[in-house]
Every structure is written in C-alpha cells, then in structure tokens.
Curated annotation (Swiss-Prot):
Chain positions of site Lowers pKa of active site Tyr: 78
Primary subcellular site in the record, as a coarse category: cytoplasm
Pathway: Lipid metabolism; prostaglandin biosynthesis
The protein's assembly and partners: Monomer.
Top-level EC class as recorded in UniProt: oxidoreductase
Functional note: Catalyzes the NADP-dependent formation of prostaglandin F2-alpha from prostaglandin H2. Also has aldo/ketoreductase activity towards the synthetic substrates 9,10-phenanthrenequinone and p-nitrobenzaldehyde.
Entry protein name: 9,11-endoperoxide prostaglandin H2 reductase
Signal peptide: none
A Pfam family recorded for this sequence: Aldo_ket_red
Binding site for NADP(+): 23-24, 48, 140-141, 162, 188-193, 234-236, 240-244
EC number: 1.1.1.-
Disordered as annotated region, ranges: 264-283
Length: 283
C-alpha cells in the first residue's frame, strides 16, 4: 500500500496506515457511508469496522462512493465471539466480505479472546491468510497470557493487537510484550470513549493543545503517532473527522510526550478481556 501519510510496517512487510477512522456505534447506511466518504476525502486511508457493529455494508458503500481505488484504502474488520471456531469463522469472514462488497480484506481480527475457541479461530485466520483473502491477520483485546497460549500452536504470529489504549490507560506492559514479539498495537477508544473518561478535559492536554493551537483530541492522536501506535478515533461528525486527521503539521516535544506519559492511571473504561465475554461465555 502506498501510504499518503505515516504507516507502520507489519512483520509480514505489509504497510498499514497509522491513522484510521473507527465506526463503532455508527448506524449502517447513510451515516456510516457518509463518515467513510468524508474521512477518505479528508485524507484517511484506513477504516476500522467489525461484524458486531452492523455497519460493514455502509463501510463498503462509503469506499465505493469516495471514488478512491479500493487498493488505496485499508479495511479492518473482526470476527465476533459467537462466530468463533474454525468453520464458523471461515463462514463469518465470507459474510463480512460480502457485506463490505470487497474481494479481499486488509486485516481480519479476532475481536475478543473469549474462553475456549480462539486457538481454532486463529487456525481459520491462518487459512484465510494463506489463501490471500486477507493481507494481514491479528487479534483484539488479547493480554500477554492469551498471546502466549496462541504462540504454542500458531504457524503465523499475529501482526496486530487492537486494544483499549489512551492517556489514562497506557497498557505499558502489553505494549512492551507486543514490541518484543513484533506485533503492532492499535488503540481503540484512543480519546477515552466520551465524557465518562474525561480525558479531553485534562488540564495537561489542554495546556499542550493551546501551545500548538490544536485541540486536546489532536494532541492525543499525535501522542499515539509519536509512540508508533496505530490509532482509530471514531466519529460520524464531518468536522471532527477532518480535525482528527489534521495532525501532520505539528510535533510534540519530548517534554510534552513525557507529561502525557505521566497521566497514566491504569484506568480501563471498556471490558476486561479476562472477565468480559460478550456473545456468550461458550466462546
């Protein structure tokens, strides 16, 4: 992929755009399609969805409406817990591919580890990769012990681990583990998932934002980028989509990076992968 902005190189040498649009909670149809089209018009070349978001069809529609060649847009989607298991995952992939209207998917992830089936699910992802139906495969919400278990039987190690990560929950131990095993990190809810986190009202971020004439959200996105983290802020608002992409004309100083690093509280907002089993514990 020829990136028109920063990319990270995965361990299979595929390049993945470092800033993407997340579409969690976007309504399928016009809302999702418009958000995707606006993002691509603003310069994004990475869209992150999942089957459980129920908006894959809208993502595909937005890509087609943008007029940008398919090969220039990175698309990530995910297999849901109730579809885990070898055969069910293969069927779930084809369903997602059909909904998206795409011949291939750039990155396919296991959405949550669940309890029992992620090893067999991973074997299905390896098959999809070997058949060139996906350009990369990975996981989401996997802790080091989940990855260690997967390493015991996998032929291909995950290229990406998408996890909750923001200034109040910086996942340093997990980031270091993934770095040691050459697994790229993607941050979901990089801005803290709304008002409940209060991240964007933090005075440290506010002061840094003023210095650069940027918003606190832009500062957080820039912090991710300078740490080598792939980041996928979500929005369906055209102005915010454009604002979140406008982060290439400034750079945080070492001191500013350190100040943000010191905000960590190990404050998880979303589910804990060790006791969060959406879609049923049987997964």
């Amino acid at each position: 992929m020829n990136c028109n902005y920063n990319c990270v190189t995965l361990h299979n040498s595929v390049r993945m755009p470092q800033l993407g649009l997340g579409v969690w909670r976007a309504q399928d149809g016009a809302e999702t399609a418009n958000a995707v089209r606006w993002a691509i018009e603003a310069g994004y070349r990475h869209i992150d969805t999942a089957y459980i978001y129920s908006n894959e069809r809208g993502v595909g529609q937005g890509i087609r409406e943008s007029g940008v060649p398919r090969e220039e847009v990175w698309v990530t989607t995910k297999v849901w817990n109730s579809d885990q298991g070898y055969e069910k995952t293969l069927a779930a992939f084809e369903r997602s591919r059909e909904l998206l209207g795409l011949e291939y998917i750039d990155l396919y992830l296991i959405h949550w580890p669940g309890k029992k089936k992620f090893v067999d699910t991973w074997k299905a992802l390896e098959k999809l990769y070997e058949e060139k139906k996906v350009r990369a495969i990975g996981v989401s919400n996997f802790e080091p012990h989940h990855l260690t278990e997967l390493f015991k039987s996998c032929k291909i190690r995950p290229m990406v681990n998408q996890v909750e990560l923001h200034p109040l929950f910086q996942q340093r131990t997990l980031r270091e583990f993934c770095k040691q095993h050459n697994i790229a990190i993607t941050a979901w809810s990089p801005l803290g998932s709304g008002e409940e986190a209060g991240i964007l009202k933090n005075h440290v971020l506010g002061e840094i934002a003023k210095k650069h004439n940027k918003s606190p959200a832009q500062v957080v996105i820039r912090w991710d980028i300078q740490h080598g983290i792939v980041t996928i802020p979500k929005s369906t608002n055209k102005g915010r989509i454009q604002e979140n992409f406008n982060v290439w004309d400034f750079k945080l100083t070492e001191e500013e990076m350190r100040q943000i690093d010191e905000l960590n509280e190990d404050k998880r907002i979303g589910g804990d992968p060790d006791n969060f089993f959406p879609g049923g514990e049987e997964a």
